[in-house]
């Protein structure tokens, strides 16, 4: 039976500034605060869907900032969405794509909210709209990004002993190449036999630097190298993939299905980091995964350091993937000092457990969010490197 149409009544975008538990140092920026971009869509039947379009480091990571995401949703997306049928998320998103260019993060936030509302309406978890779960939990890596070797080792020891994480991704690329390599090798030696070490360069190296470091990482048994060179250098990424003794993962080079197809056709990566926001939404991310699987490229569930909404939306989708060899890094809420859910996400025994309820399966603490929202608390703290 075709669902009775339900009008979208309102679309609200909220910026929420939350300090991090420690400085989070990337090659492009050092974050002391994360700005969550939340979207709340109210429907005529009383259902409320939520989504998130959070990015990293303001404008340091990509072409959308928290502020631009909010302005573009409020100014362009919201007026168009009001009055559309909320029971047809695909049709609503097709309308947006047909009229507006780019804005992948903004589109992702809106699409998540629409799918959350529709799954609630149907009384099923959001994952059911993408074929259903294959797993009820996902492995979660932890990112070590203080920039201090001793501190990173101590942090890894703590979360490992707490049975929260046993895979560690090291953010590197902001220091001299030899210093970065020494930092990684020291941590790998400290954790050897207990935890797996991977590195994320965030495009900071040249091709020759990546070759030099890759040989040393292979000798040290580092498991994975993420986006070592510029995203637009696909030919270089292919050369590294062909040469490397350590698997190469594409991240910033993946802006959706078209990039996934180009990279897969060129065999320019061993692994794809799938991110819902970077892919333009849940549907785009599902298509990226399908292309990877067809090309026999491994999958990894990436993060934009989202809060609970974006994190669990990602987990809902990743739970439907037939293959998720490299697990996920859906640790974003654990990096934040404030909890925005009435019941926190459950991280236990090295995995994130998916909730069983309808939609995203979470309940937001709107009183807390109102206290943290940008119009009552100013200032995301970002240091550019």
Swiss-Prot record:
Alphabetical keyword list: Aromatic hydrocarbons catabolism, Isomerase, Manganese, Metal-binding
Active site: 171
GO biological process, one term: amino acid catabolic process
SUPFAM superfamilies attached to this UniProt entry: Enolase C-terminal domain-like, Enolase N-terminal domain-like
Catalyzed reaction equations: (S)-muconolactone = cis,cis-muconate + H(+)
Pathway terms, separated by semicolons: Aromatic compound metabolism; beta-ketoadipate pathway; 5-oxo-4,5-dihydro-2-furylacetate from catechol: step 2/3
EC numbers: 5.5.1.1
Record Pfam families: MR_MLE_C, MR_MLE_N
Gene responsible for this protein: catB2
Protein name: Muconate cycloisomerase 1-2
Keyword Metal-binding on entry: yes
Subunit: Homooctamer.
The keyword Plastid belongs to this UniProt entry's keyword annotation: no
Function: Catalyzes a syn cycloisomerization.
GO molecular function: chloromuconate cycloisomerase activity; manganese ion binding; muconate cycloisomerase activity
InterPro entries xrefs: Chloromuconate_cycloisomerase (IPR013370), Enolase-like_C_sf (IPR036849), Enolase-like_N (IPR029017), Enolase_C-like (IPR029065), Mandel_Rmase/mucon_lact_enz_CS (IPR018110), Mandelate_racemase_C (IPR013342), Mandelate_racemase_N_dom (IPR013341)
Record family assignment: Belongs to the mandelate racemase/muconate lactonizing enzyme family.
Binding locations of Mn(2+): 226, 251
Cofactor: Mn(2+)
Lineage, top ranks: Bacteria, Pseudomonadati, Pseudomonadota, Gammaproteobacteria, Moraxellales
